[in-house]
């Protein structure tokens, strides 16, 4: 039985000075009816809270830590950089070195601009798309998260292709009116949207694997269809690979699915655990960004040496063979979960992509946000708390992706399967 007394005390103190006691909403554990666990340190595939409880970590800071916690080479790279100075506000050579590595590995990127978050990357890419095409509307997909930029916090209305409605107080109707939303994996819905608004659409922004409704891969023809649509209408195709970049494949999701967008947004892995974002693409488009062009974007800490060194050392270490191992381990997890859920009579649907996977407590195949929402959320809450008590740290939301690192092995997978079996036995008998 885990003891959380120090975490509970820390949360009470945090709520006095932070909104809801956290700096990002999902960390509050509200969706699992629990108080958040405060972490102290991590090593490899494991993370330890301030009460001394150790967990196998499948959150990995929401994806960035593909090499696991406290990778010695990454820690050394950060330390060496910090000893020289944490930030200069000038160009440094390491920015160029990381940019070269990104360009080498991401098929669509010819030029890349470093920023400080995934949200900043998607906001900047959309501004660039609007400036480049001289159009204003953006098409996105229901249930996909592209950061907290105002124009992207939009909820779909009724019908196949609708103009958006604000999904958060503070988002104006004017911004929402320029956002078109259709269901993920619905190429026919996208076609209808283009038939109605095609000459006004600056860009389609899409996660090539949706990671914020759980993990939902594209169905056959979806990404290819978007590529064809945007090309035919003179719109840009933006892949939001903040989560999937270097997670799905050595060459990111676009390399795995062999679909090349006009612009790509990155984050998470390319910062090695430090704040980072990037957007890049075709030279002719990227050269419209200041100072080469007139579309403005800037940032005080963009390309800061700590994040650049951490990111370079992380990406440098990854090999094509790592992704073979990821797929083998996740297949082992999938087969084990499937066998146990059938034996324990727990409905379960599993999706996977590279080093990411998602599971839903439903009999339905999950291909979009509507089918993701058929998952038994009440069961998930109980399941989550029980798994946490057995030392398995998962995202505290049904609608988040699950990650592994190069430090996860069959040992961790098998321990997790044992915990899953015990949990299902407790909850379902």
Swiss-Prot record:
Its EC number is 5.4.3.8. The keyword Protease does not apply. One of its GO terms (cellular component) is cytoplasm. The modification N6-(pyridoxal phosphate)lysine is found at residue 268. Its cofactor is pyridoxal 5'-phosphate. GO terms for biological process: protoporphyrinogen IX biosynthetic process. It catalyses: (S)-4-amino-5-oxopentanoate = 5-aminolevulinate. Pathway: Porphyrin-containing compound metabolism; protoporphyrin-IX biosynthesis; 5-aminolevulinate from L-glutamyl-tRNA(Glu): step 2/2. Keywords: Cytoplasm, Isomerase, Porphyrin biosynthesis, Pyridoxal phosphate. HAMAP family: HemL_aminotrans_3. NCBIfam families: hemL, PRK00062.1. Homodimer. PANTHER family: GLUTAMATE-1-SEMIALDEHYDE 2,1-AMINOMUTASE, GLUTAMATE-1-SEMIALDEHYDE 2,1-AMINOMUTASE 1, CHLOROPLASTIC-RELATED. Belongs to the class-III pyridoxal-phosphate-dependent aminotransferase family. HemL subfamily. This is Glutamate-1-semialdehyde 2,1-aminomutase 2. It comes from Listeria monocytogenes serotype 4a (strain HCC23). The lineage of its organism: Bacteria, Bacillati, Bacillota, Bacilli, Bacillales. The gene is hemL2.
């Amino acid at each position: 039985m885990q003891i959380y007394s120090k975490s509970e005390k820390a949360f009470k103190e945090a709520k006095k000075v932070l909104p809801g006691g956290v700096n990002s909403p999902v960390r509050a554990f509200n969706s699992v009816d629990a108080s958040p666990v405060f972490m102290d340190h991590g090593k490899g595939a494991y993370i330890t809270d301030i009460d001394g409880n150790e967990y196998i970590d499948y959150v990995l800071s929401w994806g960035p830590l593909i090499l696991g916690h406290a990778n010695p080479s990454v820690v050394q790279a950060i330390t060496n950089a910090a000893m020289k100075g944490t930030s200069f506000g000038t160009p440094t050579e390491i920015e160029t070195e990381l940019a070269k590595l990104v360009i080498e590995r991401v098929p669509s990127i010819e030029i890349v601009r470093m920023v400080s978050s995934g949200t900043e990357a998607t906001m900047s890419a959309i501004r660039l798309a609007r400036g480049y095409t001289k159009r204003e509307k953006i098409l996105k997909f229901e249930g996909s998260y592209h950061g907290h930029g105002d124009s992207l916090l939009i909820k779909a209305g009724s019908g196949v292709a609708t103009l958006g409605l604000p999904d958060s107080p503070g988002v104006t109707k004017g911004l929402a009116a320029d956002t078109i939303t259709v269901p993920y994996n619905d190429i026919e819905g996208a076609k209808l949207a283009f038939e109605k608004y095609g000459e006004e659409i600056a860009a389609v922004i899409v996660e090539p694997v949706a990671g914020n409704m759980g993990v939902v891969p594209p169905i056959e023809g979806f990404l290819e269809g978007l590529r064809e649509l945007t090309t035919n209408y003179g719109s840009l195709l933006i892949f939001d690979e903040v989560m999937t970049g270097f997670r799905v494949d050595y060459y990111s999701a676009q390399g795995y699915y062999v679909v090349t967008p006009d612009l790509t947004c990155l984050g998470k892995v390319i910062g090695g655990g430090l704040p980072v974002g990037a957007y890049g693409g075709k030279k002719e488009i990227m050269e419209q960004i200041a100072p080469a062009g007139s579309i403005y974007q800037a940032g005080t800490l963009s390309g800061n040496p700590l994040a650049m060194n951490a990111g370079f050392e992380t990406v440098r270490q990854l090999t094509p063979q790592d992704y073979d191992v990821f797929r083998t381990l996740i297949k082992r997890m999938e087969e084990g979960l499937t066998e146990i859920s059938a034996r324990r009579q727990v409905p379960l649907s599993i999706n996977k992509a590279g080093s990411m996977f998602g599971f839903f407590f439903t009999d339905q195949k999950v291909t979009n946000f509507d089918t993701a929402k058929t998952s038994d959320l009440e069961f998930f809450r109980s399941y989550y708390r029980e798994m946490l008590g057995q030392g398995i740290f998962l995202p505290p939301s049904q609608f988040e992706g699950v990650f592994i690192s190069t430090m996860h092995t069959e040992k961790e997978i098998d321990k997790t399967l044992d915990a899953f079996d015990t949990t299902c036995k407790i909850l379902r008998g």
